[in-house]
């Protein structure tokens, strides 16, 4: 498996690419350089928000008919909301766990190309 970043806009650009454009550019690049016998590609979130990382992964999987499985290996984009909800307090563990579960579920749906923004709380 490979563990790359997605092709996203640079920090100095004034325009923001759509998730569809990011997906198309990323997949186009990989089709040129990644052998079809590579079993999977797991993406890093690389400076994206939680929602951006999920939406971009979803858009790539919606392209369909790809030779690789596309999934995620997110750190911050999987944990940030849960850590914020927890804030190191025992009394926040339940909400933090639910927050983490939600984010994991959203990313799981994105690996299937079945995530929709309406599913976000």
Residues covered by each model-derived region:
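Active-site capping/gating regions of soluble enzymes
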Residues: 1-121
């Amino acid at each position: 498996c490979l563990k790359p970043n997605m092709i996203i806009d640079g920090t100095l650009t004034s325009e923001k690419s759509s998730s569809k454009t990011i997906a198309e550019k990323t997949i186009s690049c990989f089709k040129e350089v990644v052998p079809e016998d590579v079993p999977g590609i797991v993406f890093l979130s690389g400076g994206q928000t939680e929602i951006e990382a999920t939406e971009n992964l979803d858009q790539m999987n919606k392209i369909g008919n790809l030779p690789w499985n596309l999934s995620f290996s997110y750190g911050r984009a999987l944990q940030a909301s849960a850590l914020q909800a927890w804030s190191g307090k025992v009394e926040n563990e339940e909400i933090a766990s639910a927050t983490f579960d939600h984010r994991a579920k959203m990313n799981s749906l994105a690996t299937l190309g079945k995530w929709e923004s309406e599913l976000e709380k």
